[in-house]
Every structure is written in C-alpha cells, then in structure tokens.
Amino acid sequence: QFPTDYDEGEDDRPKSGLGAR
C-alpha cells in the first residue's frame, strides 16, 4: 500500500507527506 508513515487507527490517513493525495 503506502509507506509506513501512517497513523494506524486513523482511517489510514497519512500523517506525513508520504502517500498523501
């Protein structure tokens, strides 16, 4: 999927600029 820069438990929303639409 996307880089491991996501907040697990936040609807798979990127907290960084890695994979952010």
From Swiss-Prot:
UniProt modification remark: Conversion of fibrinogen to fibrin is triggered by thrombin, which cleaves fibrinopeptides A and B from alpha and beta chains, and thus exposes the N-terminal polymerization sites responsible for the formation of the soft clot.
User: Glycoprotein: present as a keyword of the record?
Assistant: yes
Region Disordered: start and end of each range?
1-21
GO cellular component terms attached to this protein's record:
extracellular region
Q: Which residues are glycosylated?
A: T4
Q: Which residues carry this modification: Sulfotyrosine?
A: Y6
For this UniProt record, give its keywords in alphabetical order, as a comma-separated list. Answer: Adaptive immunity, Blood coagulation, Coiled coil, Disulfide bond, Glycoprotein, Hemostasis, Immunity, Innate immunity, Pyrrolidone carboxylic acid, Secreted, Sulfation
Q: Describe, as the record does, how this protein assembles with itself and its partners.
A: Heterohexamer; disulfide linked. Contains 2 sets of 3 non-identical chains (alpha, beta and gamma). The 2 heterotrimers are in head to head conformation with the N-termini in a small central domain.
Q: What is known of its domains?
A: A long coiled coil structure formed by 3 polypeptide chains connects the central nodule to the C-terminal domains (distal nodules). The long C-terminal ends of the alpha chains fold back, contributing a fourth strand to the coiled coil structure.
Q: What does this protein do?
A: Cleaved by the protease thrombin to yield monomers which, together with fibrinogen alpha (FGA) and fibrinogen gamma (FGG), polymerize to form an insoluble fibrin matrix. Fibrin has a major function in hemostasis as one of the primary components of blood clots. In addition, functions during the early stages of wound repair to stabilize the lesion and guide cell migration during re-epithelialization. Was originally thought to be essential for platelet aggregation, based on in vitro studies using anticoagulated blood.
Q: What protein is this chain from?
A: Fibrinogen beta chain
The organism of origin for this protein: Syncerus caffer
Gene this protein is translated from: FGB
